[in-house]
């Protein structure tokens, strides 16, 4: 049975990358990211997100191929704009592909895609994926120029990078980054885009972001994997989904930069 708490209020995409990281750390076949994905669906995940990196540091090609036909919800495949990755995506045909920047030396994705600076390349990738029947999302910073460029690329979806909000060291810095994200959501909607968000969100900073009414979906992975060490995998997924839904439905949480 798949559990859904208030379906349609706000979607949770559970990223399974770091289940694969744990598997690969010892070169074993466990923990199985496929099993993690299916159990996440049962616990209320609205989609499964996974990033096939060029160096295959966590998710592998076989994981993507094995998972695609087993999902009851939908697959959101993150990948870089390379001919290899685009060809793999067009072969496997996930429901969604989120195009992300990628550097081999980074620990995790460090910022948004520079759509404005690589407009022709991004546009071509969007066309290739759309022609294959795949919905395209662009992972970008909450920057007006990048949002406008994403709309011009004919990408129907953007995912706003929340890393700077999540990594803020002071209350003032976090409040400023929250305002940037909120403004980015509003700008995306004005361009007619579906607006998602993610990166660095966890159990004590997700509430203000989840409360923003213009956000359709949040993609969260590392925090859920980490919390599962103590709470159990399905409990961790259920708890995150419940927090997000409560925030969207009006439960009062502190908003960065506003009085409690």
Curated annotation (Swiss-Prot):
Pathway: Cofactor biosynthesis; pyridoxine 5'-phosphate biosynthesis; pyridoxine 5'-phosphate from D-erythrose 4-phosphate: step 5/5
Class in the EC hierarchy, top level: transferase
Site feature location: Transition state stabilizer: 159
Main localization of the protein described in the UniProt heading: cytoplasm
UniProt-annotated binding residues for 1-deoxy-D-xylulose 5-phosphate: 17-18, 53, 58, 108
CDD domains in UniProt: PNPsynthase
Enzyme Commission number: 2.6.99.2
Active site (UniProt): 51, 78, 199
Entry keyword set: Cytoplasm, Pyridoxine biosynthesis, Transferase
Keyword Cytoplasm: yes
Cell compartment(s), UniProt: Cytoplasm
GO cellular component, one term: cytosol
Binding annotation for 3-amino-2-oxopropyl phosphate: 15, 26, 200, 221-222
Reaction equation(s) it catalyzes: 3-amino-2-oxopropyl phosphate + 1-deoxy-D-xylulose 5-phosphate = pyridoxine 5'-phosphate + phosphate + 2 H2O + H(+)
InterPro entries listed in its UniProt record: Aldolase_TIM, PyrdxlP_synth_PdxJ, Pyridoxine-5'_phos_synth
UniProt similarity note: Belongs to the PNP synthase family.
Biological role stated in the UniProt entry: Catalyzes the complicated ring closure reaction between the two acyclic compounds 1-deoxy-D-xylulose-5-phosphate (DXP) and 3-amino-2-oxopropyl phosphate (1-amino-acetone-3-phosphate or AAP) to form pyridoxine 5'-phosphate (PNP) and inorganic phosphate.
Cited NCBIfam families: pdxJ, PRK05265.1-1, PRK05265.1-2, PRK05265.1-3, PRK05265.1-5
Subunit structure, as described in the record: Homooctamer; tetramer of dimers.
Protein name: Pyridoxine 5'-phosphate synthase
Gene name as annotated: pdxJ
